Design a protein with these regions (language model features):
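Juxtamembrane and targeting peptides
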Residues: 1-11
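Structured, amphipathic secondary-structure segments that form assembly/contact surfaces
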Residues: 9, 13-130
Length: 130
């Protein structure tokens, strides 16, 4: 779950790097994550990252997982830093999903597939000048 968030939400102003990381992230999840990618892409989010020379870094604070019931319910708390030429914005990111057991592979070494991925919160916390 941590690796998925790092791949999906850490972006650099390089189109091929974005596509590579997103592709690797989507190998760990079902269509719910792809739907977010498609929505962000259609709204021009990734193009604005590249055009604005913006770096976005995610730091996962905690991953809460209920291993008592299957599929395993997960809630992830993270911080996003959106680094622009003139300012840095810190955002709060909270997501939920479920984990399904799956075969381990080179692309998915932990053997879990993320399903029902949903962004619950993604709001600005602070913005400071650079």
């Amino acid at each position: 779950v941590r690796r998925f968030h790092e791949l999906f939400f850490t972006l650099s102003p390089d189109k091929s790097a974005i596509e590579g990381n997103i592709s690797r992230a989507l190998l760990l999840a079902d269509k719910s994550a792809y739907n977010y990618y498609r929505d962000f892409s259609e709204k021009g989010y990734y193009n604005r990252i590249v055009a604005g020379n913006i770096n976005q870094v995610v730091q996962v604070d905690s991953v809460l997982c209920d291993f008592d019931r299957y599929p395993y319910a997960v809630r992830t708390y993270a911080r996003q830093m959106i680094i622009r030429a003139t300012n840095v914005t810190e955002r709060s990111l909270v997501t939920v999903c479920r984990l399904l057991n799956t075969s381990r592979s080179d692309d998915n070494p932990n053997g879990f597939n993320i399903e029902g991925f949903e962004i619950v919160e993604n709001k600005d916390v602070t913005t400071r000048k650079r």
